[in-house]
């Protein structure tokens, strides 16, 4: 800029235009805040008046509280509300998957699953709700006609076969988006919760190991880490 006696004769100013707004996670504030999505245009100014355009200043996301500006990629980070819901759904899906693989006759496994789901955020979850949902899944799958009121004791291990199975789809949809926002310790903790459900009524069944292996893959864990976590859980007294 060109100044003479404190007066700006010539310079460049960025003019911002708001294109949208919403809620996002502001790293500067450390929580959920409102934002404005803004696009800037640089203009040549003479005596403080914007005249000729000098190109685009790009698009930014501006926090309405701290005014900090970030790139549009800041909107890819889920808000704490959305993240909590993703984590809650993930634990719920893992609990259902483990119960499905191991059968639902073990009371200890059912109680451990209910406790995990409640801790994750479904505070009013009951055994009857979990069993009802499992029975509905079985009936919808069509593998056990008329099974809306009960589950086979050996679970649905065969539902794991093939990427088109309901179990594979549910695990991928619930875990893969979440894994991108979890630290390694967080991904391991989700797997560990599933392991504790499986171990609540005895050693791992083959189908339970298969399910937990699928959980680990959906969370982005390598096979060695998944095996290490499962073995460590098996050695830990309940």
Language model features by range: what are they?
Residues 1-100, 104-238:
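Small-residue-enriched hydrophobic alpha-helices in membranes
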């Amino acid at each position: 800029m060109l100044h003479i006696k404190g007066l700006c004769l010539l310079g460049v100013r960025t003019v911002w235009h708001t294109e949208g707004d919403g809620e996002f996670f502001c790293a500067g504030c450390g929580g959920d805040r409102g934002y404005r999505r803004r696009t800037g245009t640089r203009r040549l100014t003479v005596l403080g008046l914007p005249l000729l355009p000098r190109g685009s200043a790009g698009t930014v996301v501006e926090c309405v509280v701290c005014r900090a500006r970030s790139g549009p990629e800041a909107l890819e980070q889920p808000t704490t509300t959305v993240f909590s819901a993703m984590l809650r759904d993930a634990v719920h899906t893992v609990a259902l998957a483990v119960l499905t693989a191991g059968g639902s006759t073990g009371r200890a496994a059912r109680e451990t699953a209910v406790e995990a789901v409640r801790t994750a955020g479904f505070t009013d979850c009951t055994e009857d709700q979990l069993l009802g949902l499992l029975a509905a899944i079985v009936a919808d799958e069509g593998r056990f006609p008329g099974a809306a009121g009960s589950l086979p004791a050996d679970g649905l291990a065969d539902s794991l076969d093939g990427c088109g199975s309901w179990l594979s789809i549910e695990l991928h949809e619930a875990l893969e988006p979440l894994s991108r926002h979890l630290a390694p310790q967080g991904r391991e903790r989700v797997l560990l919760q599933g392991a504790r459900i499986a171990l609540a009524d005895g050693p791992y069944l083959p189908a339970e190991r298969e399910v937990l292996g699928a959980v680990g893959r959906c969370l982005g864990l390598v096979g060695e880490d998944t095996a290490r976590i499962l073995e460590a859980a098996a050695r830990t007294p309940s």
